Amino acid sequence: MATKCELFGIRKKGYIEDILETVGLEGVGKKKTKHFSLGMKQRLGIGLALVGEPDLLVLDEPINGLDPQGIAEVRDTIQRLRDERNMTILISSHILEELSKIATDYGIIHNGSLLQELTSEELMKRCSERIEIELIHPEQAVPILDRMGFTNYQVTD
């Protein structure tokens, strides 16, 4: 991290310590990174990305391969950056359950193309729980569902 600070011309006393504190690594001292857990290494990588104080942070699968504690630590770091620094964070991940705990907006990409952009509320509505019922006469289900007050349903043959 010191080398990257040097490359950016940053010589402010305590700068590295502030970044380490931001990513929850304030207590590591001179500990060698080879002794870091995977979660600690992920947070160190985020810390390195923070050198120079960017407005946008891009993270590719930041929780992939982490144990539950590591996931929680990285999630807390991301939330802290979002809330305390008002930072925009673009996360590429296939783990929607975990993203739902921190994301405000989603972009669905398939084969390199952006298919759809959704707010977290829109995504939750589209992914809400559902039941599937097989009926002999599915057309008879519509009036019953309407009388029961259901509005978000689909009847298929």
Task: Kindly label every feature range from the protein language model.
Residues 18, 126-128:
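Short, solvent-exposed coil/turn segments
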